[in-house]
Amino acid sequence: MNKTTKAFLATLIIITTAVGFTALKAQAEPIKPSVVVIDTAIDASLPVFKGRLIQEVCAMEWALCPNGTGFQEGPGSASTIPMNVLKSVSFNHGTQMASIAVSSNAYVNLIFIRIVGMTKDGYRASTTEASVVKALDWVIANKEKYNIASVAMSQGNHDLATYNLLCPKSNLIKYIDTLKSINVPVMLPAGNDYDITRVDYPGCIPQAITVGAVDKFNVINAYSNGNPTQVDFYTPGTVKSILPGGTQTTVAGTSASVQSAAVYWATVKMVKPTLSYDEIYQLLKATSTPTSNSKVKNGSLINIEKATK
């Protein structure tokens, strides 16, 4: 660890964030770690993203990015969408997830990758695995440029007829494995279907890190899919978020849990930069708080305070 890093770490102070967790804020300015949020679209005009949203990307199988192609990078790439559409149920998810991410640690930067297209009629186009592949491929290529620490994608499906074919034979595996080899985890939701027998696709992919939700009492929420053989970590599932246009709301689900888990990983990487992927994973496991409910036992609730000591 060089003198600059030591001096920076010495200036870290503990603060309590808007979502009620402890995070780290810096008074010095080395290269900040970035969390990539892959989702629907983002209201980049919101004050919460000022100085935090450092890159927008659009990556889709279809030619539905704002520039009329299947790829776009730069301001407006993920946010050029009519406000009435952005506020709709089909597209407001991304802004909410990004707001949770930036609220979980005041020091982490945000990169937003849009993978959901809008049809000519203003409806949500289908989201494909190929779009996610393009997004992850961009992350691999830009990991060093933006100091990317983790990826959060709060998208999933529990009712695929091809579920058993996709897990664990998804085309995403190669890209998730590559990111793991460069110390970047891909965090995915367990899903919210009250099903303790399995988690959503693509969270079922073994190479990914699957995140479930606990309630305000740190008990595993009944809606949180899977069990600890399938779910790597748990974090609170009911948190405050911001909708497009700036209205504050409360969101509940494993989608929210994914965002804080990804930021917690980035926080550990920031405080302990020499740790590898496997070392951070084991540290989060070793310092976690046991969690359970009446049907699911031995879950691992991330304890970021212990993990960053």
Positions of the model-derived regions?
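Structural recognition of the beta-strand scaffold that forms the well-ordered cores
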Residues: 34-38, 109-114, 147-154, 185-189, ...
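Bacterial N-terminal signal peptides that target proteins for export
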Residues: 1-9
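Substrate-binding/access-modulating region of protease and related hydrolase catalytic domains
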Residues: 116-205, 217, 246-259, 293-296
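Extracellular S/T/G-rich loop segment that most often corresponds to the catalytic His/Ser-adjacent loop
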Residues: 33, 39, 200-270, 274
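C-terminal subdomain of the subtilisin-like protease fold in secreted/lumenal serine endopeptidases
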Residues: 146-155, 170, 182, 207, ...
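Active-site core segment of subtilase-fold serine proteases
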Residues: 28-109, 117-119, 134, 141-147, ...
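Sec-dependent signal peptide cleavage junction
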Residues: 19-30
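Bacterial N-terminal signal peptides
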Residues: 10-19
